[in-house]
Swiss-Prot record:
Cofactor binding notes: Binds 2 Zn(2+) ions per subunit.
Protein's UniProt name: Alcohol dehydrogenase class-3
Name of the coding gene: adhI
Binding positions for Zn(2+) 1 per the UniProt entry: 40, 62, 170
SUPFAM superfamilies: GroES-like, NAD(P)-binding Rossmann-fold domains
Length: 376
């Protein structure tokens, strides 16, 4: 069949809207009609050419929601008509990682997914002249129709709006999950969130959901103060407006008459800046503070700290897709949204057509959007 898609023909160039060929699902695969897709910084990272693993031509996009229209042989967990969210982190429930119950990083299709291919080593997309087009993060949601492995779709309730729940495919889950699954924040905790973009705001609402008592947001942009407060932030710090070291400032903020050591129980880096990652660790409480690294640093970047920071009880942890097991946890997060436990609507700042998709990247570069969503 043919489908409309925004194709990344080469790095550094705007996406091109065109008709492409899409082959139907093979064994263990499903075809999904994408109804809405978010535009994420990871898509921009690859399109810019900065991603060392970026390959072209490809159909980007990994934050979508849609309806199953066809299933291949052997598919049992979804059927045509089911509403689903594509998963760039699948859940096969059979590989050593899934069976360990210690990680969400399923390895079942990791090798081929990283090459922009389906599990059988081929692509379902091609140009009208037959030139293969690569998949992206196993999803390719910048196409009106896409094909995914069965293990890479989460079935969700049919009454949830596509243009909101698509954000659960990446940003919402990454932020809230880092709090709930990775850090396991408890009621009454003190936390600091570095970087108040879409991920940071979702960390903040995850902290509020978990019952954190003090939620400090750190950002160089004062406009983010109002955004943070909307989602549950209790204090705001702009590092450029304080005297002295931001770590010392944060430690002092978290001191109490009972605890004069100070430091946060949990910190979260949502910036991808390795200097900020160090500050986040060192703003943790001596003896038990945990710093969760969410932001993706540039290729080749390294983190540094003095070993004394770790010897005295601080912990560095990483979190990918919020530690969420996609097929199991994503439907629950959709339920949280539908039950009013978390907010998504305010973060969807722009709704665009496929023809306007490049405007979404422009808005991101200008810092004018939290999340732009393309609706098909």
């Amino acid at each position: 069949m043919r489908t409309r898609a925004a194709v990344a023909v080469e790095a550094g160039k705007p996406l091109e809207i065109m008709e492409v060929n899409l082959e139907g699902p093979k064994a263990g695969e499903v075809m999904v009609e994408i109804k809405a897709t978010g535009i994420c910084h990871t898509d921009e990272f690859t399109l810019s050419g900065a991603d060392p693993e970026g390959m072209f031509p490809a159909i980007l996009g990994h934050e979508g929601a849609g309806v199953v229209v066809e299933v291949g042989p052997g598919v049992t967990s979804v059927k045509p008509g089911d509403h689903v969210i594509p998963l760039y982190t699948p859940e096969c429930r059979q590989c050593p990682s899934c069976l360990s119950q210690k990680t969400n990083l399923c390895t079942a299709i990791r090798g081929t997914q990283g090459q922009g291919l389906m599990p059988d080593g081929t692509s379902r997309f091609s140009m009208l002249d037959g030139t293969p087009i690569l998949h992206y993060m196993g999803c390719s949601t910048f196409s009106n129709y896409t094909v995914l492995p069965e293990i890479a779709v989460a079935k969700v309730r049919p009454d949830a709006p596509f243009d909101k729940i698509c954000y659960i495919g990446c940003g919402v889950t990454t932020g809230i999950g880092a709090v709930i699954n990775t850090a396991k924040v408890e009621i009454g905790a003190k936390a600091v969130v570095f970087g108040l973009g879409g991920i940071g705001l979702n960390v903040i609402q995850g902290l509020k959901l978990a019952g954190a008592d003090m939620i400090i947001g750190v950002d160089l942009n004062n406009a983010k103060k109002e955004w943070g407060e909307r989602f549950g932030m209790t204090h705001f710090v702009n590092p450029s407006e304080i005297d002295g070291d931001v770590v010392a400032h944060l430690v002092n903020m978290t001191k109490t008459p009972f605890d004069q050591i100070g430091g946060a129980d949990y910190t979260f880096d949502c910036t991808g800046n390795v200097k900020v990652m160090r500050q986040a660790l060192e703003a943790c409480h001596r003896g038990w503070g945990q710093s969760i690294v969410i932001g993706v640093a540039p290729a080749g970047a390294e983190i540094q700290t003095r070993p004394f920071q770790l010897v005295t009880g601080r912990v560095w942890k990483g979190s990918a897709f919020g530690g969420a097991r996609g097929r199991t946890d994503v439907p629950k997060i959709v339920d949280w949204y539908m039950e009013g436990k978390i907010q998504i609507d305010p973060m969807i700042t722009h709704i665009l057509s496929l023809e306007e998709i490049n405007k979404g990247f422009d808005l991101m570069h200008a810092g004018e959007s939290i999340r732009s969503v393309v609706v098909f």
